[in-house]
Amino acid sequence: MFSLKLFVVFLAVCICVSQAVSYTDCTESGQNYCLCVGGNLCGGGKHCEMDGSGNKCVDGEGTPKPKSQTEGDFEEIPDEDILN
């Protein structure tokens, strides 16, 4: 019974690992997918471009990294304006 549980756990881990998308360092040609959030992994003056098919290193501006929200990002609305 223990070995059956161990086998099921092992099988689940294998399935999860096989479904993962692997990202590598971007090549100079920009063919490899890359991670844009949390750091710019594109070398050689290239920038990361995010789209539906995957992130690629490209020449030019690329897509800006998402900005985290902080307290100063939003203008406070006075209570009087909300209640009226």
UniProtKB/Swiss-Prot annotation:
Name the SUPFAM superfamilies on file. Answer: Leech antihemostatic proteins
Q: Which Pfam family is an annotated match for this chain, by its short name?
A: Hirudin
Q: Where is this region: Interaction with fibrinogen-binding exosite of thrombin?
A: 73-84
Record: glycosylation sites: T63
Where does the UniProt annotation place the signal sequence? 1-20
Q: Where in the cell is it found?
A: Secreted
The biased composition feature labelled Basic and acidic residues covers 59-70
Q: Where is this region: Disordered?
A: 59-84
Keyword vocabulary terms for this entry? Disulfide bond, Glycoprotein, Protease inhibitor, Secreted, Serine protease inhibitor, Signal
A GO cellular component annotation here is: extracellular region
**SS bond list:** C26-C34, C36-C48, C42-C57
**Record keywords: Signal included?**
yes
Alphabetized GO MF terms: serine-type endopeptidase inhibitor activity
Superkingdom per UniProt:
Eukaryota
State where composition is biased (Acidic residues): 72-84
Q: Where is this region: Interaction with thrombin active site?
A: 21-23
Q: What does this protein do?
A: Hirudin is a potent thrombin-specific protease inhibitor. It forms a stable non-covalent complex with alpha-thrombin, thereby abolishing its ability to cleave fibrinogen.
Q: Which family does it belong to?
A: Belongs to the protease inhibitor I14 (hirudin) family.
Output this protein's name: Hirudin-HM1
Organism encoding this protein: Hirudinaria manillensis (Asian medical leech)
Taxonomic lineage of the native organism: Eukaryota, Metazoa, Spiralia, Lophotrochozoa, Annelida
